[in-house]
Amino acid sequence: MTILSAITSISRPNKASKSSVSSFGGASLSMGSNSVACGGCGGGSSGPRGPGGVAVGVAVDVNINLGVVVGGVLGLVGGILGGGGSSGSCGCH
């Protein structure tokens, strides 16, 4: 599945859902139905890396409802860009 198809894939528009994005480097992102992106920090040292430390081949597990598409796109970008670096984690602030 490509990132574009994951973003445009919308399921269960009437039900609140949670989106989750992770990369090979261990960075993860989750988003509740309130459109607040959580995570995007704490990439590990494992997995193939492309230029700038961004993990190549992002594994995406997405269940986006219609009300959180914009937040999901922004959170996805933040999760990918935050994927490099030392181990750790970030939550909702």
Swiss-Prot record:
- Point to the regions of Polar residues compositional bias: 1-14
Q: Where is the composition biased (Low complexity)?
A: 16-26
GO terms classed as biological process: sorocarp development
Give the transmembrane region(s): none
Signal peptide start and end residues: none
Q: Which Pfam families match?
A: Coiled (PF05710)
InterPro entries registered for this protein in UniProt? HssA/B-like_chaperone, HssA/B-related
Which residues lie within the region annotated Disordered?
A: 1-26
**Into which family does the record put it?**
Belongs to the hssA/B family.
- Name the chain's protein: Protein hssA
Report the source organism.
Answer: Dictyostelium discoideum
**Gene field:** hssA
